[in-house]
Amino acid sequence: MILLAGAMALSIGNTLAHAANFYAAPNGSDANPGTVERPFASLQRAQQAARQARGRQPVTVFLREGIYYLPESLCFTAADSGTQTAPVTYQAYMKEPAVISGGAKLANLKWESYRDGILKASVPAGLTTDQLFVNGQCQPMARYPNFDANVRHFNGCAADAISPQRTARWTDPRGGFIHAMHAAEWGGMHYVITGKGQDNTIKYEGGWQNNRPSDMHRQFRMVENIFEELDAPGEWFLDTKTSTLYFYPPAGVDLSTATIEAVRLRHLIEFRGTQQAPVRFVTIKGLTFRHAARTFMENKEPLVRSDWTTYRGGAVFYTGTDDCLLEDCFIDQVGGNAVFVNNYNRRLTVRGCHIANAGGNGVAFVGDRDAARVPRDWKDHSQKLATLDRTPGPKTDNYPAECLVDDCLIYRSGRVEKQTAPVQIELSQGITVRHCSIYDVPRAGINIGDGCWGGHVIEFCDIFDTVKETGDHGSFNSWGRDRFWGLNGLDLNDDKTWTAEKDLVRLDAVKTVILRNNRWRCDHGWDIDLDDGSSNYELRNNLCLNGGLKNREGFYRLIENNIMVNNGFHPHVWYKHSQDVVRSNIMWTDHYLPAGGMPSTPWGREMDRNLVHRPNAAEPKPAAGLAKQSQRDANSIIADAMFVDPAQGDFRVKDGSPALKLGFVNFPMDQFGVQKPELKAIARTPQIPRLMTPAGDGSIKPALQRRHFVWQAEVRDIAGLGDRSAYGLPGEYGVLCVNVPERSLAAKAGFQKDDVILACNGETVRTVDALLDLQNDSAGKPLRIDVHRKQGTLPLTVSDYAFAAVEYQPSPDFKAIPLALAGYLAPARILAGEPGAMNEPISVLTDGKLARNYGPVFANGVVNGAYKLDLGAAKSIAEVRTFSYNQNNNRGRQRFVLYGSSATSDPGWNAADRRLFTPIFDLDTRKTPPTEFVATSIRQSGEQPLGIHRWLIWAVTPATDNAGGENTAFQEIQIIVSPAK
């Protein structure tokens, strides 16, 4: 049977008219007067009593120990309000454990064996639940893959989760759930299975839980609530058609004595007022909230241009309140949001609370989208400068403001929904988060979803172990994306436009957001990530333990007096007139870490007096690398910061530290996180990193990385989090199109600058080398390319391209790529560029012979060697063959970029000059160890010519990393011209 609290009974008698205190207990009776000796049974009955007594004096409803199974959500309205001098309080009596439950106890179940360790029992007809609690712990639904606490994504994921081979085992999967990561790991998405086709293809609906939707991630996906997947201890399945509960009890669980609970309600307590008639001065104190249903399929509402959608609800729900307080409560294992603060709320405080294992957000503040003057969505490109609403600030007051989250411990939120945060702030103003410890979460610890309307303060918080299941994010994340961002007709990099329109950038971000005196650590992103136009921020006294600090786009950011341990400052895609200030910080890297386009003019408004830490540095010296990049930093230095005790997390600097002379001011290292003794005793703290000992003198060295070309476009590998964020990629992989000349083969195929190549012929492309391998394997057949452009995937086809074949032989007797006879070759004159080749004379490269020697080789460490061939006149080139010898078993590999020029006179050696030279092919055979001799052949698809050129340059790069870089022992170069037509 299902046991619920007793129903409300009897009206309130006159005997309670002057009472200030009421009592409730699960073993009480609603027929009782509500005294400590004769308490009520239900909270609804106690609420009636409090309503009658409120307003004349403080009213307190004391809850005695036990579980209060709510028949329906307990709803407070303006009729429940107190006053400043006569507040209304609902609290646990003498700290007794009082639990508010949205569930139901399943009693007297008769368990019997089913199979393979699984038991079954009949439950009341009509019972539905999406969670099962056994002895107070939520158990996993029957799922695939099985739950594994050590797996990063979903505690178990598999690419074949919904493959036909898998689903063929499922008789009726309707009602099952699919959970998957966004393709770019920007949160999660969820689906309900609606059926299965005859070909075992699953039918489903959902995926709307992300404001920038995508296909499911190919690897990070799982299914649950599938009967046939019930195969691991702890898993359960409820067959609602037969009202049968199946459970695989873990070792040590005795179901004859265990407490079994199902979940019924989404919301446990609701505060439902309005701006005109708010719920006022009501406190909830010292209670435990448990058994709230999951709401991931109701998470549908897009939140303007953040990446989020939301469900406006939670275990504790506030809308339309003034001066209410949630204090010293434990919100445990609720299925959706723990606390949701919706639309109009003023001076709401959440203090001293312990929030653990929520399915959704910890505490979410979300205002009304219609309070924004320009509530644009991602697909809305209709706004234009000429018609823009230029009125600063919000349009209405229907949003949270002047609210506080104080001294709270919040961890392991986002157990189900991955686009969530322990503290979420969106369409709000003046939210303060103070002395909170936040950790073990899938995405950011604190997220501010837009610039509307600022005034938030994040201080003395300890936030770490974040972004554990997602990517391209930080322990703190914010987006701006305000009225000015991406506005049609507005170019804020233009000097005149900036002068005339600079006020636009603070129309929404009307108040400054302050982050101060916090400790952050993110091992899967940035410690602090001010993303996509985040503007009007002040960051002071932040200790960043791992991921550094990022500013992307945006305006008016002050970055001062922060410490970036083992990392540095990441400026991404700055506006020319950003007005950013970066000063008096301590960092590890001797250079900035930009991504995307940075202005050619001096960066920001001020970048100076920063210190690059070098332990045991004898004397401070200029931070030349910072200064060269920013064109500022005239007074920034490299020096020993002289930390007090960094191994123990004390990054204050000692007296006499050079940082103090730069304006750095010590800030406390012992006030991060919760201060409440009960919470501090159980709160974790971050691992203090082992300090890196950076090298380098701060000067910028010339880049030794060779330039890469594909289809005559310059490309490079995607590198690191910066690129992933700058180009909005699904991972830290791909090939970026750096430059796509108008007449290049890439341009003809439809490629553009800043395209990122993610796949070729269905195979993931992680690097340039991988792309070249796939291209060469295709040997002239059309290439199907998946391109990432402006957050979308675009299919392109490349039919016209050069490719290479390679042959290895133990002797000069090549079969597929033999030395061509003289009659097929273009006569040529060979030259070597500075610093000149060694050993054999350069002329041997065109003598028609292969030898076992070094050939005209470049010295070790020469990274810019080049050979140039003059054909005497421009000729149509059918094939280029290049031969090498594996001298000393390490010089046979070929690594060069082949360039061509049709200039009538010698074009010189600067192959990078696209006016004179065209890149023909990028070749690298290092992947396969050579035998004695190596031959390569470069041809064009469709038996077309490689081009019409007189001059050819082989820009060679060392083929090994030994001895400073050993160059290839080239033996012969042959040019086969196209037959005359």
Residue map of PLM features:
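Extracellular beta-strand/beta-solenoid scaffold signature
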Residues: 107, 111-120, 262-272, 301-316, ...
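PDZ/PDZ-like domain segments forming the peptide/carboxylate-binding groove
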Residues: 716-759, 763-766
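PDZ-domain C-terminal substructure recognizer with occasional recognition of PDZ-binding tails
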Residues: 752, 758, 763-764, 769-813
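Right-handed parallel beta-helix
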Residues: 280-291, 322-336, 345-360, 369-391, ...
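Predominantly extracellular beta-rich ligand-binding scaffolds that present long acidic/polar faces
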Residues: 71-78, 85, 89, 538-648
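C-terminal, low-ordered peptide segments at domain boundaries
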Residues: 702-728, 784, 791-815
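Extracellular polysaccharide-degrading/modifying enzymes targeting complex plant/algal/animal polysaccharides
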Residues: 21-332, 371-395, 649-653, 657-699
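Aromatic, loop-rich ligand-recognition surfaces of beta-strand-rich domains
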Residues: 264-273, 278, 293, 297, ...
